[in-house]
């Protein structure tokens, strides 16, 4: 089958790889000059299935109000009055109760755990290297309340079968030696030993080369104007004066998916702006071993071979990609506070990207009412974590194979009022 994939980020490229391996003739189209040039370019670098959770959670609306008056707030909102933004925020607000949180987290952890298994298999089959490390993730707590919340929230991990270690502050240096110098600032941490790290852009670029060698065609520098449709099917992709035709079409345009699908399929994917710093390592012993998550500031600090990636924060500001100095100062503050000797911050590269976020946090993967249009978008801050699983899942569904995990509640159909999943999976409530 001829398949056209729109988008060459980590989700689009993994989709291309798995569809090609399933025997399909795949073409990837992107306006950029190469793969992973936008959202996948400089993300936090963590592959953390156990921490997969929606931003829409109990208590977030009240926290958002408090964050409005904080200099280093993890979330910022700038209202623009557009119906798109207001509707999305209202949908997110409706997901901030315990029942929805547990349903959404259950879906996300299921896909994220499966994705890690798919990445492990891909690594074994191809030998792909991307400065990866299987050193786990350590979530740091700065207050007694955060530590207390974690003791209750671990029931969620137990329900999903995710291994964990709850550590007091005195034990943090056992897994992250550089934290010995700052342990007095912390109350403890939650470690997930099975989590991984890696350079998402490097992975995507190398997998794209492997996919090209396997027969995938990449059409870079090719802006897409619109999808052409009639009745219940897509019949082409209009790119300038050219119409590219296929048997099936996959939307993996990230934050731009919603606009491209306007009038065809209504999906609630909104651009959630985030920032990162990439810092050269000065003293390896003063840098993190793997990934650190600062619970207070929602900042991730990840170790690559010779670099530290510091990423996080979320801004609901539409498609604005301005690099704001106060956001850089927040990233610098957190990394200086935890790893003062680790990196040469003055030489850091500052970056921003738009994460394609759904109001319930769960990506949109699967079929649509158009018989040859498929979606793989809306992964939010977890595109790197979920990419391989989403690509394999999409390939299986499109190819008529039975996927390894339940998937109907990942499709766009879940937003219908009459939707009932075939095999609903929910976690026992432990969120506070």
From Swiss-Prot:
Pfam families associated with the record: DAO (PF01266)
Cofactor: FAD
GO molecular function, one term: D-amino-acid dehydrogenase activity
Keyword Transferase attached: no
Annotated positions binding FAD: 3-17
Reactions catalysed, as given in the entry: a D-alpha-amino acid + A + H2O = a 2-oxocarboxylate + AH2 + NH4(+)
Enzyme class: oxidoreductase
GO CC aspect terms: cytoplasm; plasma membrane
GO biological process: D-alanine catabolic process
Keyword match Flavoprotein: yes
Keywords: FAD, Flavoprotein, Oxidoreductase
Domain of life: Bacteria
Enzyme Commission number: 1.4.99.-
Pathway(s) annotated for this protein in UniProt: Amino-acid degradation; D-alanine degradation; NH(3) and pyruvate from D-alanine: step 1/1
Family assignment from sequence similarity: Belongs to the DadA oxidoreductase family.
PANTHER family: D-AMINO ACID DEHYDROGENASE (PTHR13847:SF280), SARCOSINE DEHYDROGENASE-RELATED (PTHR13847)
Function, as annotated: Oxidative deamination of D-amino acids.
Name under which the protein is recorded: D-amino acid dehydrogenase
Gene: dadA
